[in-house]
């Protein structure tokens, strides 16, 4: 793990310390929503709790939701984009993609700022601390059907 000579405390952010030259920014300042459709020639991607964003073809278990026959409304995802399953984010179904492909129109796709390191963003945005924030900031009817709105 890389170490730095100086750190600063971030008490409003879980009372942690970060390298002193790092900025603390809200998600909306480093990400913007995008929705590019009609990319039906790209591979199908999905978001899983245990892996984040992966090619759909790499998973073998049965799915409860069938893939649509018409992929024209599916959204383009590029490597480095943050993909959020807005109904399952509270459980951790989020990730920064390493792949280019398309995801369900039910997902939220955010283009991340180029200054972010994708691997670190994936680690942070999938961390327990962030997943807890998705739970806190989601709305629900009952305890299972929760949605997070961007």
Predicted regions and their residues:
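Residue-level "contact hotspot" at macromolecular interaction interfaces
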Residues: 73-76
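DNA target-recognition patches
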Residues: 32-68
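Non-catalytic DNA-recognition/assembly elements of restriction-modification systems
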Residues: 5-39
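Basic, amphipathic alpha-helical recognition segments used for DNA target recognition
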Residues: 26-37, 99-100, 109-150
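Short, well-ordered beta-strand elements within core beta-sheets of diverse protein domains
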Residues: 13-17, 108-113
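A generic structural signal for residues embedded in beta-strands
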Residues: 84-85
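Structural motif
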Residues: 78-81
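Short, charged beta-turn/beta-strand-edge "cap" motif at the junction between a beta-strand
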Residues: 89-92
